[in-house]
């Protein structure tokens, strides 16, 4: 569901996408972290074919209906509840308040614990609960230091507080990632660099 992005960005086409789709077709299940289009792309899901979809039991009725229509089976996991899938144990931690659809995925595998925070806000108490259940081998989370998400599409460079607001959000992003590493103490941390590369013209204003 990650293979296509927001519509203003260049379409992801060509051999790299073909290869990614071929790999995706071998997957047994699909995890949907949240409703944003760079994580939930219905066309991509149609292209890889119906598969069991795993997601949180969100309040967003439209999201759930869309996922159900695309899945061979929809598996909705209540917040923090354990779901067994083969040799793995899965937990989904939904972001609060409950109207949000963001989620953190915690997977216990025979090879170690994986935590994928996606774009979700990190809650210290949730991270502490995860850490208490065992050593984290891999921690994935966003580190969009370009800060090209909200509120920056609504700002102009000539605004007097532009630089201050950009710097504040960038610092929040760094602090959140550092908090995750501090609490989880993972063997390896992997940062998502954000939806647009630094040299892309869409980031020129930064």
Residue ranges and their predicted role:
Residues 1, 26-40, 54-58, 115-120, ...:
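Active-site neighborhood of phospho(di)ester-bond hydrolases with catalytic His/Asp-centered motifs
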Residues 1-31, 42-47, 122-135:
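Pre-active-site segment of Zn-dependent metallo-hydrolases
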Residues 2-9, 93-114, 120-125, 131-134, ...:
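Active-site-proximal loop/helix segment associated with metal-binding centers of metalloenzymes
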Residues 11-14, 98, 120, 169-174:
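A conditional alpha-helix N-cap/helix-loop micro-motif detector
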Residues 35-40, 61-64, 81-84, 98-101, ...:
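Active-site environment of divalent metal-dependent phosphoester hydrolases
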Residues 41-50, 201-205:
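Metal-dependent catalytic neighborhoods of phosphoester/phosphodiester hydrolases
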Residues 51-112:
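Metallo-beta-lactamase
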Residues 124-206:
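Cap/insert and terminal regions of metallo-dependent hydrolase folds
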């Amino acid at each position: 569901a990650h293979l296509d992005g927001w519509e203003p960005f260049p379409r992801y086409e060509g051999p790299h996408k073909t290869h990614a789709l071929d790999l995706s077709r071998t997957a047994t299940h699909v995890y949907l972290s949240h409703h944003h289009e760079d994580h939930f792309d219905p066309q991509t899901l149609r292209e890889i074919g119906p598969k069991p979809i795993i997601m949180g039991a969100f309040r967003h009725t439209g999201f759930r209906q869309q996922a159900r229509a695309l899945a061979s089976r929809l598996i909705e996991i209540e917040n923090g509840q354990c779901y067994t899938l083969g040799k793995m144990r899965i937990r989904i931690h939904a972001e609060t308040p409950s109207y949000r659809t963001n989620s953190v995925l915690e997977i216990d595998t025979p090879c170690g614990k994986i935590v994928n925070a996606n774009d979700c806000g990190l809650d210290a108490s949730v991270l502490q609960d995860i850490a208490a259940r065992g050593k984290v081998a891999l921690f994935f989370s966003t580190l969009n230091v370009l800060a090209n998400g909200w509120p920056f599409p609504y700002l102009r460079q000539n605004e007097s507080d532009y630089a201050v607001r950009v710097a504040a959000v960038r610092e929040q992003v760094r602090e959140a990632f550092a908090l995750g590493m501090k609490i989880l103490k993972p063997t390896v941390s992997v940062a998502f660099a954000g939806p647009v590369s630094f040299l892309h013209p869409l980031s020129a204003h930064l």
